[in-house]
Amino acid sequence: MTRKIFESDLEELHSELLRMGSMAEKQIYDCMEALEKQDENMAEVIIKKDDIIDDMQKEIENKVIRLIAMQQPIVAEDLRNIFTTVKIVTDLERLGDHAVDIAKAIKRLNGEKHHDIVKEIWNMGNKVKSMIKDSLDAYVERNLDKAYEVCKRDDDVDSLYKRIFNELLNIMSEDKSKVNQLTQFLFVCKYLERIGDRTTNVCESTIYLITGKQVDLND
């Protein structure tokens, strides 16, 4: 394989990663819309679409294997590029799984009228959505500052999760009639927090791609 063909295949790999990222991002957007509208049909569509994300991951990983097999020797920078792609794709697939978890929780709400605390969950969802978008932008732009900035925002998501979690437990202790709804809200918040962690992982991979240094910013 010539260098020119290798670089073209590598660029196509990145394009497929971004297509996968866009779909995973939309899954989260749709989750929050389904929660707001109490739309069980939309939640079901989210669940079914996860198979597409899984297939995209497998296809990208297969292309990575073929690329490594056909391009020898591989220089360190190229290997880092490929390794980063695999790591990010893995986190995007997990992100899609968490979208499914949220969609399933939405279906279990059974159309109950929302408690006012749902507004706090929408706020948390908006923060996570912006993190996903900006993490992918940081990867595309090779923007080190943006990658670190997105990681810092995960601390806000973690703090919000803890506060909402405690509020939900307090409300449950006072109003037993809302236990099912509030329990599902707990699940939604838990998975939003995990999505924030996955997004931080994407930024860590971008930092590694740019600097060659592995960092752990998910503490």
From Swiss-Prot:
Transmembrane stretches, start-end: none
Gene Ontology cellular-component terms listed: cytoplasm
One Pfam family matching this protein: PhoU
Domain of life: Bacteria
Function text: Plays a role in the regulation of phosphate uptake. Encoded together with proteins of the phosphate-specific transport (Pst) system in the polycistronic pstSCAB-phoU operon.
Gene Ontology molecular function, alphabetical: protein homodimerization activity
Quaternary structure, from the entry: Homodimer.
Family designation: Belongs to the PhoU family.
Name this polypeptide is given: Phosphate-specific transport system accessory protein PhoU homolog
Keywords: Cytoplasm, Phosphate transport, Transport
InterPro entries the record matches: P_transport_PhoU, PhoU-like_sf, PhoU_dom
GO biological process: intracellular phosphate ion homeostasis; negative regulation of phosphate metabolic process; negative regulation of phosphate transmembrane transport; phosphate ion transport; regulation of phosphate metabolic process
Subcellular compartments: Cytoplasm
Induction, as annotated: By phosphate limitation.
Gene designation: phoU
